[in-house]
Amino acid sequence: ELLQDGNNVLIVGRNPKTLEETGKELAGAATYSCDAGKAEETTGLVDAVKNGKIAGFGDNVDGLILCAAVFPNPATKTSVVQPEPEELQAMLDSNVTAYYRLVKEFLPLLAPGSRIVLIGSTSGIRRDRGGIYGISKWALRSYAYALREECKPMGIGVSLIIPGGTFT
């Protein structure tokens, strides 16, 4: 609908092949390959948008819809003690820190009336079997609530959408 309404849409993904296929399906959308869990790649994305290196984008952004996620090893997905600390850190980098970094960088480009939409997970609500993925989505939920309060005086809305089970 955003494209149909004449908006510029930028789709960002870490898998170039999937990104290319999605770009073909959504004619008119710009695409950019980036692993949101890697700081240097998100810095490149922000630079490309701010400096007009992506057609239709420049020094203002009307909204953000952030839906980054990595999932745990299937063998330990419900555990909070079996995964290695590095696996938890990688999950936090993609599922929480990437959102934080992108919002921080794009916030100055958002005008009053803009909206930030964060895609969470029911694992951020459930108290059982969420494993380290649940830890990351609980953290994202907390961040979304705090961000909403901080952005209110700026006239920027923040929504956390918690869909049922999906694959991103």
Describe the residue ranges of each PLM region.
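Canonical Rossmann dinucleotide-binding motif of NAD(H)/NADP(H)-dependent dehydrogenases/reductases
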Residues: 1-9
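Rossmann-fold cofactor-recognition segment
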Residues: 26-40
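Amphipathic alpha-helical dimer-interface segment in Rossmann-like NAD(P)H-dependent oxidoreductases
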Residues: 51, 93-114, 149
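Conserved mid-core segment of classical short-chain dehydrogenase/reductases
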Residues: 56-60, 69-89
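Rossmann-fold scaffold of SDR-type NAD(P)-dependent oxidoreductases
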Residues: 59-69, 95, 118, 159
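Catalytic loop of short-chain dehydrogenase/reductase
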Residues: 70, 115-139, 144-145, 149-152, ...
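Catalytic Tyr-X3-Lys loop
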Residues: 81-100, 117, 140
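Conserved SDR Rossmann-fold cofactor-binding beta-strand/turn motif
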Residues: 157-167
